[in-house]
Amino acid sequence: MTKPRQYHITTFGCQMNKADSERMAGILEEMGYHFTEDPYAADLVLYNTCTIRDNAEQKVYSYLGRQAKRKQEKPDLTLIVAGCVAQQEGESLLRRVPELDLIMGPQHANRLQDLLEQVEGGSQVVATEPIHIVEDITKPRRDSTVTAWVNVIYGCNEHCTYCVVPGVRGTEQSRYPEAIRAEMEELGRQGFKEVTLLGQNIDAYGRDLPGTTPEGRNKYTLTDLLYYVHDVPGIERIRFATSHPRYFTERLIKACQELPKVCEHFHIPFQSGDNEVLKAMRRGYTHEKYRRIINTIRSYMPDASISADAIVAFPGETEEQFENTLKLVDEIGFDQLNTAAYSPRPGTPAATWDNQLSEEVKGDRLQRLNHLVAQKAAERSQRYAGRIEEVLVEDQNPKNPSQVMGRTRGNRLTFFEGEINELKGKIVAVKITEARAFSLTGEAVEALVTA
């Protein structure tokens, strides 16, 4: 009996990449492949790549080098690079790693079977041309059985001076609401409890779809989508990410307050607290507008959890401008903040500027920001102490098998004693006994919110 071919996928980068990997895994399993955790036992190895940070890109090349050596000993190994590095580098990847069989940009994720058939025909395939994204044609192999990502808009029409995403993920392409709802209904039937709607700029959803309302706004918006999918049977929680401050409206905020399944957690990157830096980044808003958005959210939902992204040491950033970022972080008080020192990316305007800052300055500013972030997150966490929170149980605590772990509506990771086989996928009322900067510990109270 022939042994089934095994595949392995390593994913770098954002939630969009993780969702793409799940879809590609689903295609491979429909083709008869079996998943293996070991990339060196696999017959097909796929690296789904990210270009946002240079260190992630260099790690990909390191992994590829090892697999290229392996392919010399195992010629039937299929070696694939997908995602943003594939899109950006294209055929030049073949010169660097001639052992590659397939190079495919993120727009081609749903075409994996067709592309592999071309590879099996003896071709080295490079698929990076812009296309209209093929609607989901397979069931993704989800990494979780409790929570799931659902893409609602692909691509990005912004042109931030530091970012490669528009060049590698293409222009915005929104899915129609009917397709999104159908995918969520299938997830509900399969027992999933939480869905995160995904987009590079998710609050730009629907701008590219036809039609306007009598009031003159787009017929399809993220706000309308939330109302449309809110009653999907079986889905208990809805989240969305990532939001752009330019498109985050009070109408959207009001909908989130009105719709009980929509969690009070908002991920809205600000990138810098200084208006001159924001202008150089070409972000299209001021720090005053960003503050108004957060104030409006908190006026509707005082307990809302806010997370964001920030970049320090952008080209030309002065000490005073950096301190404006510290001031914004101190005054807003984020529940979580993803921070990074500026990393010049090939093909972006900012990478060509001659006012780059030193690695020493980058390291110093990142350390100072991270110290403040941890301090503010710890302060924000204290509001949970002694409260009862609804926690959706996702898995066992890998560091303590007697505990399960899940997330509150505010997206705070929470641990408590319990049996995973009994509690996985259930929403449990948990009294918080310990509040740390980025996680909570508690005790289950008797009532289960949902069975």
Curated annotation (Swiss-Prot):
User: Which keywords does the record carry?
Assistant: 4Fe-4S, Cytoplasm, Iron, Iron-sulfur, Metal-binding, S-adenosyl-L-methionine, Transferase, tRNA processing
Q: Enumerate the InterPro entries for this protein.
A: Elp3/MiaA/NifB-like_rSAM, Methylthiotransferase, Methylthiotransferase_CS, Methylthiotransferase_N, Methylthiotransferase_N_sf, MiaB_methiolase, rSAM, rSAM_horseshoe
Domain of life from the UniProt record: Bacteria
Q: What is its EC number?
A: 2.8.4.3
Query: Which of this chain's residues are annotated to bind [4Fe-4S] cluster 1?
Result: C14, C50, C84
Q: Where does [4Fe-4S] cluster 2 bind?
A: C156, C160, C163
* Location within or outside the cell: Cytoplasm
Provide the primary localization: cytoplasm
Q: Where is the Radical SAM core domain?
A: 142-379
Q: How is the cofactor bound?
A: Binds 2 [4Fe-4S] clusters. One cluster is coordinated with 3 cysteines and an exchangeable S-adenosyl-L-methionine.
- Keyword Iron in the entry? The reply is yes
Q: What does the record give as the reaction this protein catalyses?
A: N(6)-dimethylallyladenosine(37) in tRNA + (sulfur carrier)-SH + AH2 + 2 S-adenosyl-L-methionine = 2-methylsulfanyl-N(6)-dimethylallyladenosine(37) in tRNA + (sulfur carrier)-H + 5'-deoxyadenosine + L-methionine + A + S-adenosyl-L-homocysteine + 2 H(+)
The MTTase N-terminal domain is annotated at 5-121
* GO molecular function terms attached to this record: 4 iron, 4 sulfur cluster binding; metal ion binding; methylthiotransferase activity
Name the needed cofactors. Answer: [4Fe-4S] cluster
Cite the record's note on assembly.
Monomer.
Give the matching HAMAP family.
tRNA_metthiotr_MiaB
The record's comment on protein family reads: Belongs to the methylthiotransferase family. MiaB subfamily.
Protein name listed in UniProt = tRNA-2-methylthio-N(6)-dimethylallyladenosine synthase
**Gene source species:** Picosynechococcus sp. (strain ATCC 27264 / PCC 7002 / PR-6)
